[in-house]
Amino acid sequence: MNRPALPRRLLLAAALAATTLSATLAPLPALAKDITLLNVSYDPTREFYADVNKAFAAQWKARTGDTVTIRQSHGGSGKQARSVIDGLEADVVTLALAYDIDELSDKARLIPADWQKRLKHNSSPYTSTIVFLVRKGNPKGIQDWDDLVKPGIGVITPNPKTSGGARWNYLAAWGWAQKKYGSQAQAQQYVARLLANVPVLDSGARGATTTFVERGVGDVLLAWENEALLALKELGPDKFDIVAPSVSILAEPPVTVVDKVVDKRGTRAVAQAYLDFLYSPTGQDLAGQNYYRPIDASAAAKYARQFPKVELFTIDQAFGGWAKAQKTHFADGGTFDQIYTRK
């Protein structure tokens, strides 16, 4: 027996309803998100991270469709670490030295104690060293560390209590003196004479550069290599010269995600990708362009000619690591306090 045919109008309505239901149940494309990260960094990385942030944001947008904005905070490395410990919600920190990041674990449990093992090269995607920036023509004839303690030489360096760069400066000088004179006591005497030639201690490396370059104070600036090369680029080689000392320290600025912050904010994936980007070919190229020494062999070879030849020693070789160096030299009552309170 044949069933009566349904009216055409009802068939169309049923078809429309089925289509609507199917569309309702179909998965919707993910909506693009706007993400903000805070990178708390040390003083002279401003130009570098401006380039990194632009390149990473473009890559992340192409890969995920999400818009990521990276905000920057810059200052003396020790001061920056204390700000994070006191509650500044950094998704990542890119500081001047490992001890300052260790403090985030030791004092606030913001990161695990083994944070430095999570990325290659002890979580340092680039390196640097300490050189001398002098006025054009080097009128005071400064060639090596022993020239810095001569009478009448004005030496500009920041305060090691607040600046990571200043601690690298201090240890570079100490390491040279210890090698030359053979004892800790003589090294301390040398550093005391050097500090006696320092007219002012700025809180960070960029402030010290401003004092030397813009205010015209002093005869020589103890500087991050990248900061000295940037000064030549921006201000012109007709105003300053770089002097590479015979021996200096290998500065290894490390990076990490701040676990408690990224887990609270839900930003771990993008924060980790941001740090991984520093190790990528593009990130390494940007490091070289901004006068940091890349750790990737091909990038290091590409930019090798822009860096002076310097014999380098490491913090582990000369001082037994950052924890020991900090306690001996920069903690309350350490050698810096012993020297500077007598100044």
Language model feature labels by segment:
Residues 32-162, 337-342:
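N-terminal segment of the mature folded domain
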Residues 129-138, 252-269, 286-290:
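A bilobed periplasmic-binding-protein/Venus flytrap-type ligand-binding module shared by bacterial periplasmic
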Residues 40-42, 134-136, 154-180, 195-198, ...:
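Short beta-strand->loop
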Residues 137-143, 162, 175-183, 261-269:
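Short helix-loop capping/hinge motifs at secondary-structure junctions, enriched
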Residues 262-343:
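Extracellular/periplasmic juxtamembrane helices and adjacent flexible linkers that interface
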Residues 2-14, 25:
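Twin-arginine (Tat) signal peptide motif
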Residues 180-246:
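Ligand-binding pocket segment of bilobal, Venus flytrap-like solute-binding proteins
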